[in-house]
Swiss-Prot record:
Subcellular location: Cytoplasm
Annotated keywords: Cytoplasm
Record protein name field: Proline/serine-rich protein C17A5.10
Lineage: Eukaryota, Fungi, Dikarya, Ascomycota, Taphrinomycotina
Signals that turn on the gene: By stress.
Similarity section: Belongs to the HUA1 family.
Length: 224
């Protein structure tokens, strides 16, 4: 036969020839001594398995760890700032500045008993040059704006009293006769006193319209 007809050797035969594993006869004679398990001798293990077990790194420090641990990086130096505080006398550290002769630190004592009372409104006489308005006030009535004087504290006529107690002229709206004197409402030449409702203008101005004063009927004055 030629060499091509011979089958190639198997993987186990190659290992036996190289001495990696033992033959079946030698392996059958060895039995385990503990509970039927194979012996833990390294002679029955393959050479590559034994070499892999023996090649495990052992810690050089002798702490018993199977694997060596990487050493920790060195600690970084911490920059320490110089301490500017110097132990000394506390009175010198927190001493107040010396008083200056130009600065007056004395303050007048606060008077807690002092209080500001609102001045009470008094019945002021009517402004000079204006006659006192005498409305027909009912008994016991007191106006809080003018105090029954007809004029407020600002000197302007009281519209509240004029609307409630004022009388008006009998006005007829027509063309004036020839030669009549034409004056504006509230003119000083018109007899009477100034109307407190319209303040002598004879009309009331609203946001969108203007109407004639209902107290003085547009004259600007009311009779005494």
């Amino acid at each position: 036969m030629t060499d091509d007809s011979v089958p190639p050797p198997s993987y186990e035969e190659v290992l036996r020839q190289e001495g990696v594993i033992d033959s079946p006869n030698s392996s059958n004679g060895q039995t385990s001594t503990s509970a039927g398990h194979p012996s833990s001798s390294s002679s029955t293990l393959p050479n590559y398995a034994a070499s892999s077990l023996n090649s495990r790194p052992v810690s050089s420090s002798g702490s018993g760890n199977a694997y060596s641990q990487a050493p920790y990086p060195p600690a970084r130096p911490t920059s320490q700032r110089p301490n500017s505080w110097q132990p000394g006398n506390a009175s010198t550290m927190y001493a107040s500045p010396p008083p200056s002769s130009n600065y007056n630190t004395a303050k007048p004592p606060y008077q807690t008993s002092q209080f500001y009372a609102r001045p009470q409104s008094s019945y002021a006489p009517p402004p000079s040059g204006r006659p006192r308005i005498s409305y027909p006030y009912p008994p016991g009535y007191m106006c809080y704006k003018c105090h029954n004087t007809g004029y407020k504290d600002s000197g302007r006529p009281c519209g509240r009293c004029a609307r409630r107690f004022g009388r008006s002229y009998d006005v007829q709206f027509s063309r004036p006769p020839p030669g009549a004197l034409v004056v504006y409402p509230g003119d000083p030449r018109i007899p009477g006193r100034v109307c407190g409702n319209c303040k002598g203008s004879g009309q009331l101005d609203f946001i969108f319209f203007t109407e004639i004063c209902p107290v003085c009927n547009g004259v600007g004055k009311i009779p005494y």
